[in-house]
Amino acid sequence: MSERGYELKGSVFTMTVLHLEDAIPEQIQQLLEQKASQAPKFFDSAPLVINVEMLTEIPDFSKIMSAILTANFIPVGVTGVKSNEMREAAKQARLAILTAGKETNTDAVVLHTPKESIYKTPSELREEQQTSPGTTADPDNLVPTKVVQGNVRSGQQIYSPGPVVILGSVSNGAEIISNDSIHVYGTLRGRALAGARGNHDARIFCGHLEAELISIAGHYLLSDSLPEPHVGQEVQISLENEKIIFDKLTS
């Protein structure tokens, strides 16, 4: 049989991990639905890994999977399996057995001292794209900056493969997605997903942080996990060593 057109390659994906302290399907479903309501589009059919490390008994994986699917997540595997019996039970439920990965610690938020504001005007962003030390700009490979005049209303979604600049505010229920960085000159109340294609150097800038969700290269925080000192402040958000970093900005 010819193998032309088929190829196996290794890859890395960022996925949400559900840590179980007990295995009550109703409570699992309630928790997931509550989280999904904070960012419906972000969690719509999102892959989910089940961490069973804290469980002392073999759970009913079929019922847990049903609860997860009802909450509109997709269970893809389990991690933290400590016995052959639990491993077999997971396999019988058609769940992959995953080794423990490097998880993002959403509680370990690094707070930096205030620094000079590094907001960029749209023209400055275009200049950065066109020139970098030791290189010559190739106009054919440039990704233009998307500039949105005014506010982004609830229910709107803005996407760009390049940087996104919002000259107004982003309302609750609105979503900004960029493969690069996101600049919001007003208040960020909705969702901002930078580095959507895995760009760990992408950043999020906003004049007033009240976001429902912020995400960089798949690493995310919901509104209830944002560090209190930065809520309502002018901030720069970046990713360093798999941790989301918040920097205060000054005018």
Curated annotation (Swiss-Prot):
Residues 119-143 are annotated as: Disordered. Keywords: Cell cycle, Cell division, Septation. Residues 119-129 have a biased composition (Basic and acidic residues). It holds the Pfam family MinC_C. One of its GO terms (biological process) is division septum assembly. SUPFAM superfamilies: Cell-division inhibitor MinC, C-terminal domain. Belongs to the MinC family. Interacts with MinD and FtsZ. Cell division inhibitor that blocks the formation of polar Z ring septums. Rapidly oscillates between the poles of the cell to destabilize FtsZ filaments that have formed before they mature into polar Z rings. Prevents FtsZ polymerization. PANTHER family: SEPTUM SITE-DETERMINING PROTEIN MINC. This is Probable septum site-determining protein MinC. It comes from Tolumonas auensis (strain DSM 9187 / NBRC 110442 / TA 4). The gene is minC.
